[in-house]
Amino acid sequence: MEIQLFKRSGEEVSFDADKILLAIEKANQATQENRQISEDKITEITNRVIQKCNEIARSISVEEIQDLVENELMAEGAYTVAHNYITYRYERALVRKAN
């Protein structure tokens, strides 16, 4: 089943798992090297998020997907990466609110 995503604009689009992978990679790159997670772990986390999205029998919002990413990072014990992901998410929300 193809996952549908509700963007913040209200537009419904096809889910793009590469965006999750890229977001986690960026948070990982912003993390001190000794606290980073491996590319394999990033892929595993991305796959778990995709699986959880597939289990939801409806279109899912960007915020819900971001919550799933945060939860999976924390479940993996990647607290510093999760912190960077959450911080970036918060900063982007502030920018959107200011516009």
What is each PLM-predicted segment?
Residues 1-99:
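Extended catalytic cores of very large enzyme megasubunits
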